[in-house]
Structures are given as structure tokens and as C-alpha cells.
């Protein structure tokens, strides 16, 4: 198995970078005149809109780019989550040498281990409670703020229960059920934890690659039929839409640079980053390329991590991103609160004033919630 290609500090820095993209995207894409993203479905008119904005840039260009590309922080989170699962549950000393050889050798034979349901259920319960601990503090605070501010949502019993149970992603019309919207991520992560423990945990690499190819293949079929369809929307709301970056995280933890190569040279890594960014932009302009963008997002992530650790004059940025990674969980659950409060400022014309207040208040509130969440006992495995 790969030994710590991504250090804990590097993982925190990448989480920080990912959450910056996510929480800025989740503000910018709510603004009417700003380019919309292709997160769950592929809308050609959104890419045409982006091309038009790039051809005629104005003062809002950074907001357009954050709105269109910021949601790709989610694949980075999925990649890091899978990487962390493998490093935690599959690294030595949990496995014997024979088990590791069978699992990680590229030419290894198929496993025939039987499944004991008690351990998987304990694993799923533990990770559900970890997600619940993270979600509940933000959900309670958000619903109270939502109720006392203009435009409050009409909540229904099924929506509340499915949110707390983290099965809202599988219900029809998830766009209308999940509120606040970013909380769809909790249902997605629970599904991926289940898939990992039942299908991929300590299994031959072929299981992971096979599931990735199956999910990508079905998505392409849906895309060829109608990339704007509700079927595509529901598909990508669930684990199938996140299987590519999640699977890459598993494989990268096991095989390292056989999966995603870094160059261990700052200059070469910079060129690699530029190459990835160019590919991400160009592939985002058509449905087939859009399907594979998360791969290059993950590659860009490991290149950035390597670059941040090797270039001394980037150490200040590295430390800031590390700290953002530490508060990323709290920032994820609290940014819908501050968005609801400050977005009217941007909608009424002063986009950057509202955005700046949102950034400052979100980071401060996330730090406070991080301290609060430390007081909540962790679930026992």
C-alpha cells in the first residue's frame, strides 16, 4: 500500500481549498445575472453563457467563474474521504502480509471473503452518527434563521425526516426536498460509506474499477439520451454520480502514483496544474468531457498538494488553507445561514459588498461552530 503520499496537513489544505470553492459557489450561483453551473445535469446553454462571459469579461468575471466551477470542491471532498477511509481501515497493522498482497497486488486473485453483517452495520452506524453530529448543529441553526428571515421555506414532515435520516437523495425531485441545498452531501456520503463497506472494503482493485466504469457508463447513456433530464439529475444526486472521484481516492490510497502522478519538481508541477486547469475548462464545454472532469480535478488536487509542500514562499498560503481545512466541516454546515442573511445585498446590486460580508461572517461563524462541535461527544465505533 502507498505510505502517506498525502500527509494529514496536505489533506487539510486540500479540504480548505475545496470548501473555499464550495461555499463561494453556493453564494454566487444564487445571483440572477451570474453564469450557472452544470453540477447535476449538463445544460449546453450554461456553457454557451460561460463562453460569452469569457469573450466579454467584466467586473463580475471572478463571480462567474466561482459559480460555474466552484462546485468541483465536492469531488475533492469525495476523493479525500475515500483516501482517508483506506488509510484508516486498510493500512497496517489491520491486515496480514498475505491479505495485503491479495488486495493490493495488481495481479492479485479475486477475494472470496464472506460478509459478516455485524461489522458492516457497526461501521455504517458509526459514520452515520459522525455525519449527524456535523449536520444537526447547522440544520437547527439554519431552520431558525430561515423561519425569521424573508422567503422562509414551507417544511414538510417527509423532507425533515429524510434530511435527518440522510435518505433525501433517493426521493423524487431532490431539488425540491433538500433544504438547505448543500446538505445533499450528507446523503451522498452515507451512500458512499455503505458502498465502500459492503462492496469495496479490503477487496481487489477490480471491484473499485468495475464500479467506477459501470457508473460512468450509465451516466454517459443518460447523457446521450438527454443530459438535462430529471433522470440525470437524480442519478448524479446519488452515489453513482460521485463514484469516479471516490474510487480514485481509494485507488490512490492503495497504489499512489501508479494512479495519479506528481512530478516532485515545483516547475513541472506548475506546468501540470496549468495543463489540468486547461483540460478542466475545455472538457466542461461538452457532455462527454464533463463526465470526466472530476478525474482531472483530483489530479489537480494532488499536484497542488505537492506544490504547496515544496515551494517555501507558498508556506503562508499553505497554512491558511490548512486552517480552512480544520474548520471546513463547520463552514460547510453554517454557510447556508450567512448566505440567507447577506445575499439580498448582492441581489440588490452591490454584489461584492454582500459577498465580502458573507465571507467574513461565514468564516467567523464556522470557527465558533468548530468550538461548539468539539463539545459534542464523538460516537463510539
What function would you assign to each model-found segment?
Residues 219-330, 337-358:
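Alpha-helical transmembrane segments and terminal signal-anchor/GPI-anchor hydrophobic tails
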Residues 1-216, 347-381:
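Membrane-cytosol interface segments of multi-pass membrane proteins
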Residues 25-26, 332-335:
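Histidine-centered divalent metal-coordination motifs
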Residues 33-35, 47, 143, 149, ...:
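Residue-identity detector for threonine
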Amino acid at each position: 500500500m502507498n505510505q502517506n503520499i498525502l500527509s494529514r496537513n496536505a489533506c487539510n489544505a486540500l479540504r480548505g481549498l475545496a470548501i473555499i470553492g464550495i461555499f463561494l459557489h453556493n453564494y454566487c450561483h444564487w445571483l440572477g445575472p451570474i453564469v450557472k453551473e452544470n453540477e447535476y445535469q449538463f445544460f449546453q446553454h450554461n456553457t454557451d453563457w460561460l463562453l460569452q462571459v469569457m469573450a466579454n469579461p467584466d467586473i463580475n468575471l471572478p463571480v462567474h467563474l466561482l459559480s460555474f466551477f466552484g462546485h468541483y470542491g465536492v469531488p475533492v471532498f469525495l476523493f479525500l474521504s475515500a483516501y482517508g477511509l483506506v488509510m484508516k481501515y486498510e493500512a497496517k497493522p489491520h491486515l496480514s502480509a498475505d491479505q495485503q498482497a491479495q488486495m493490493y497486488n495488481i495481479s492479485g486473485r479475486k477475494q472470496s471473503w464472506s460478509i459478516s453483517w455485524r461489522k458492516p452495520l457497526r461501521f455504517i452506524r458509526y459514520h452515520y452518527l459522525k455525519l449527524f453530529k456535523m449536520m444537526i448543529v447547522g440544520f437547527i441553526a439554519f431552520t431558525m434563521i430561515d423561519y425569521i428571515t424573508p422567503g422562509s421555506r414551507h417544511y414538510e414532515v417527509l423532507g425533515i425526516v429524510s434530511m435527518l435520516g440522510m435518505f433525501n437523495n433517493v426521493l423524487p425531485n431532490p431539488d425540491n426536498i433538500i433544504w438547505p441545498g448543500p446538505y445533499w452531501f450528507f446523503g451522498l456520503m452515507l451512500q458512499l460509506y455503505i458502498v465502500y463497506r459492503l462492496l469495496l472494503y479490503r477487496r481487489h482493485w477490480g471491484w473499485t474499477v468495475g464500479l467506477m466504469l459501470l457508473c460512468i457508463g450509465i451516466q454517459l447513456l443518460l447523457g446521450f439520451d438527454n443530459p438535462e433530464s430529471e433522470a440525470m439529475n437524480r442519478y448524479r444526486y446519488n452515489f453513482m454520480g460521485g463514484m469516479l472521484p471516490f474510487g480514485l481516492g481509494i485507488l490512490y490510497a492503495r497504489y499512489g502514483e501508479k494512479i495519479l502522478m506528481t512530478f516532485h519538481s515545483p516547475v513541472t508541477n506548475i506546468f501540470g496544474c496549468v495543463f489540468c486547469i486547461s483540460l478542466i475548462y475545455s472538457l466542461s464545454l461538452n457532455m462527454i468531457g464533463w463526465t470526466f472532469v472530476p478525474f482531472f480535478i483530483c489530479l489537480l488536487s494532488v499536484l497542488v498538494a505537492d506544490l504547496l509542500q515544496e515551494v517555501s514562499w507558498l508556506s503562508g498560503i499553505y497554512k491558511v488553507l490548512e486552517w480552512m481545512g480544520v474548520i471546513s466541516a463547520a463552514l460547510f454546515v453554517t454557510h447556508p445561514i450567512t448566505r440567507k442573511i447577506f445575499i439580498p445585498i448582492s441581489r440588490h446590486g452591490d454584489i461584492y459588498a454582500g459577498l465580502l460580508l458573507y465571507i467574513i461572517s461565514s468564516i467567523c461563524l464556522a470557527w465558533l461552530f468548530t468550538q461548539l462541535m468539539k463539545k459534542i461527544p464523538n460516537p463510539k465505533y
